[in-house]
C-alpha cells in the first residue's frame, strides 16, 4: 500500500514531541512490513524540503503558523494525483479537515482534544480558533474511522456525537529493550522525584515545584529532576528561586532517550500533574524502569495508571494531595516497591510492534472496505 500521513512535525523537528514519536515508531515498522509511507509535515529552519528518514519519504511545506493553511493547496497541487491508498491525518493541535478536500479514504488519528484547556496555553484568539476547530470534528469527519490512543479520548469523541463503531483504541508503545529496570534495584535513590515532558502551562509543573516545598519540610533530602524543554522553563526556574528550591530542583533540558532511562532507573518516584493527556506514555516509560508514578486523575493519565495498583491518582490541582502522596511513598518502601512491581509487569504489554500491527490492521480494513 501507499500511505500518506499528514502531521505537523517530523521526528527531526526541534519541537518534536509525543505525536512525532508515535508516528515514527509506528510507521517505520509499517515501512518494514513492505508498505510505502510519505509524511507531509511543516518546515523548520535548516530543514530540507524533501528527504528520507528511516525509510519514510518526508515532504515539508509551510511553517509552524501556516502549515494547516498550506496543506490543502499543497495536496491538490503536488499529491492529489499520486496513487495513495489512504491518508492518515494526525489530528494533533489543529485539524486539517482533509475530508473537505479529497474523496480518498481517511484514517483520523487522535491523541487528545485540547478542549477548554487550550485557553490556559495560548492567547484567547488563537485558543478560540483551536477550540472551535475541534468542535467541527464530528461533522467534518463523520464518515471517517478514528484511531485514538486511550479510552478517554474515545469517550470524548462519543460524547461529541461520533459512533463507537468508528473508533479503535490503540495504545502507544515503548521500546522495551531500552526502558527497563536497572540490574541493581538497590541503587535507586531514596528521595529523587522526576518529571519528564514538555514545559507547558497545561502540564502544571509549577504545582509539582510548589509541592516540593512541602515535601522537603518532611524529607529535607528530597530532590526534583525536570526533564524536558518548553516555553515555561524561565518562569519555572524563577518559581524555584522564589521558593528557595534552586539547589533541590534540576532542569536537564533536552536529554537523549538513553540518558532519560538512566535518570528513571535511579528515580524514587515520577510525578505528572497535567490538566490532560492523550495517553500517559511517560507513565508507562517510568513504570518500565521500576519507578512508581503519582499523577492527576485526568484523561490519558487515568488510562495509563491503575489507581492503587500501578500508581497513585490525585485530584487535579490538589497540591496538598500531591505532596502528601509523594511523602508517603518516599517513606513507605514496601508500598513503593509493590507499585513498582505491578507497574513494571503491566508496562510489558505496551510495545511499538503491537501498536504498529494494530494500526496496520485498521488501515487495511479501511482500504479493503467497499466504496
Regions found by a protein language model. Name each.
Residues 147, 185-212, 225:
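Conserved donor-binding/catalytic core segment of Leloir-type glycosyltransferases
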Residues 152, 173:
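Carbohydrate-associated surface elements
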Amino acid at each position: 500500500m501507499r500511505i500518506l500521513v499528514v502531521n505537523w512535525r517530523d521526528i527531526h523537528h526541534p519541537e518534536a514531541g509525543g505525536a512525532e514519536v508515535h508516528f515514527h515508531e509506528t510507521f517505520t515498522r509499517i515501512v518494514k512490513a513492505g508498505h510505502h509511507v510519505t509524511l507531509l509535515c511543516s518546515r523548520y529552519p535548516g530543514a530540507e524540503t524533501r528527504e528520507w528518514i528511516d525509510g519514510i519519504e518526508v515532504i515539508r511545506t509551510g511553517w509552524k503558523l501556516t502549515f494547516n493553511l498550506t496543506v490543502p493547496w499543497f495536496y491538490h497541487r503536488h499529491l492529489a494525483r499520486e496513487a495513495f491508498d489512504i491518508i492518515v491525518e494526525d489530528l494533533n493541535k489543529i485539524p486539517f479537515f482533509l475530508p473537505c478536500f479529497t474523496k480518498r479514504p481517511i484514517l483520523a488519528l487522535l491523541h487528545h482534544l485540547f478542549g477548554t484547556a487550550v485557553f490556559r496555553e495560548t492567547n484567547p484568539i488563537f485558543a478560540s480558533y483551536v477550540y472551535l476547530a475541534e468542535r467541527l470534528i464530528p461533522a467534518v469527519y463523520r464518515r471517517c474511522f478514528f484511531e485514538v490512543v486511550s479510552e478517554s479520548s474515545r469517550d470524548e469523541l462519543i460524547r461529541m456525537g461520533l459512533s463507537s463503531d468508528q473508533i479503535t483504541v490503540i495504545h502507544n508503545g515503548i521500546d522495551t529493550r531500552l526502558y527497563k529496570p536497572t540490574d541493581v534495584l538497590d541503587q535507586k535513590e531514596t528521595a529523587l522525584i522526576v518529571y519528564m515532558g514538555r514545559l507547558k502551562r497545561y502540564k502544571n509543573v509549577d504545582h509539582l515545584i510548589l509541592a516540593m516545598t512541602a515535601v522537603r519540610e518532611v524529607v529535607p533530602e528530597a530532590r526534583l529532576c525536570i526533564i524536558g524543554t518548553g516555553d515555561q522553563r524561565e518562569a519555572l526556574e524563577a518559581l524555584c528561586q522564589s521558593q528557595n528550591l534552586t539547589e533541590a530542583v534540576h532542569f536537564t533540558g533536552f536529554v537523549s532517550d538513553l540518558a532519560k532511562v538512566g535518570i528513571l532507573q535511579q528515580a524514587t518516584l515520577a510525578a505528572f500533574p497535567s490538566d490532560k493527556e492523550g495517553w500517559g506514555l511517560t507513565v508507562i516509560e517510568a513504570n518500565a524502569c521500576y519507578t512508581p508514578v503519582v499523577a492527576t486523575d485526568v484523561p490519558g493519565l487515568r488510562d495509563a495508571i491503575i489507581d492503587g495498583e500501578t500508581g497513585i491518582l490525585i485530584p487535579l490541582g490538589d497540591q496538598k494531595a500531591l505532596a502528601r502522596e509523594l511523602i508517603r511513598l518516599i517513606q513507605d518502601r514496601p508500598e513503593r516497591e509493590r507499585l513498582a512491581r505491578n507497574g513494571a509487569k503491566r508496562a510489558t504489554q505496551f510495545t511499538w510492534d503491537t501498536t504498529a500491527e494494530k494500526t496496520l490492521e485498521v488501515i487495511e480494513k479501511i482500504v479493503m472496505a467497499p466504496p
